[in-house]
Regions:
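Short hinge/loop at the helix->beta-strand junction immediately C-terminal to the helix-turn-helix recognition helix
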Residues: 55, 60-61
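Conserved segment of winged-helix/HTH DNA-binding domains
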Residues: 77-101
């Protein structure tokens, strides 16, 4: 049976199974897949899952590794990327909430997991890419000052670095949601967009994409469309960079300010602006009883690389990673030399 003959309900169930395999980053059996699906509100029996997996094998989407279970193939990844777009609308908003919940970073103790964006590029571009990246961090245009660096075959979180490539992990802005959630502060992520900065100060949003209405991360879209000017902002203080807008309960403002300070001390700072209760922030209206925050896009330093015509493949909100494995961006060159990347 070919892909065209699969009805919508079957395709959706198959996509759910493929997503479980993709998120796991390792082979899984039908029992583990079923447990994960049920946790997400999808109830499928093991026999049914095995039937779907057998069909996935026939289509080349999954590979049977015997007792180890199945793993997702490149063809399976392509199928997920092209799945029914109507089913993916709102996916970004759901992933933001999921990762914030899964993250367990303790800002007081400075331990636990944080959320990373993963960007891969050719080894031959490592030297100029690191230079562009560090310039953006020097100007304070990243989410904090910590990064991860992976050589071919290494892992950043559950993501394996491809052969002939290096990978850079930048802290995702959703990390701030997780830090607030640990303090019982519920955060609403309204949209991602582009912010115009002048002399290093944010002025206004020039473009916005709501998370609820998008199947892709907004900053990924803007970077691919070459709509940022992060490198120019790093050099002159004037430019356009990625940012996101969040709301939180105004009653929690003192604790929000405390958490922001703790985040900055831990190298995870990135709040560009914090508003007043019920007051607009960068011309964006905020309801009574709420306070607005503008958070720097974690992929901004990567945008500076892309602006230099270096080919980069980025995935926002890609992985959970232990805080202890991150390094200061100033150590990138030394770490790259030690790993044989320069």
């Amino acid at each position: 049976m070919g892909t065209r003959s699969i009805d919508i309900k079957t395709r959706r169930k198959m996509a759910a199974i493929l997503r479980v395999l993709q998120s796991a980053g390792k082979p899984l059996g039908s029992q583990r897949i079923g447990e994960t699906l049920r946790a997400g509100g999808i109830d499928l029996g093991e026999r049914t899952i095995r039937n779907y997996l057998s069909h996935g094998d026939e289509l080349g989407w999954t590979e049977n590794l015997g007792r180890r279970g199945r793993r997702l193939t490149k063809l399976g990844i392509q199928e997920l990327e092209g799945e029914l777009v109507v089913d993916k609308v709102g996916f970004v908003a759901a992933r933001v909430d999921m990762l914030a919940y899964q993250m367990d970073f303790d800002a007081d103790a400075r331990r636990g997991t944080v959320i990373l964006n993963i960007s891969t590029l050719s080894l031959r571009d490592a030297r100029p890419a690191i230079t562009r990246l560090m310039e953006a961090f020097d100007a304070g245009l990243g989410m904090g000052r910590l990064v991860a660096l992976g050589a071919p075959g290494e892992h950043i979180g559950a993501v394996r670095v491809p052969k002939g490539c290096c990978a850079i992990g930048t802290v995702c802005s959703v990390t701030i949601n997780g830090i607030f959630l640990q303090a019982r502060i519920a955060t609403t992520s309204r949209f991602g967009g582009l912010v115009e900065v002048e002399q290093g100060r944010p002025l206004r949003f020039t473009q916005i994409i709501t998370y609820d209405g998008s199947s892709l991360d907004p900053l990924e879209i803007f970077i691919r469309g070459h709509m940022t000017s992060v490198a120019r902002a790093a050099k002159t203080g004037n430019g356009v960079l990625g940012a996101s807008f969040r709301e939180a309960p105004a009653i929690a403002l003192p604790e929000i300010q405390r958490r922001i300070e703790l985040s900055e001390r831990a190298g995870l700072g990135g709040v560009l602006a914090l508003g007043s209760p019920g007051q607009p922030l960068l011309d964006i209206p905020v309801p009574q009883g709420r306070v607005g925050l503008v958070v720097c896009g974690g992929l901004n330093p990567v945008a500076a690389i892309v602006e230099s015509d270096i080919a980069v493949t980025s995935t926002a909100m890609s992985a959970l990673c232990n805080y202890d494995t991150l390094i200061e961006y100033g150590e990138l060159r030394k770490t790259a030399r030690r790993k044989g990347l320069l």
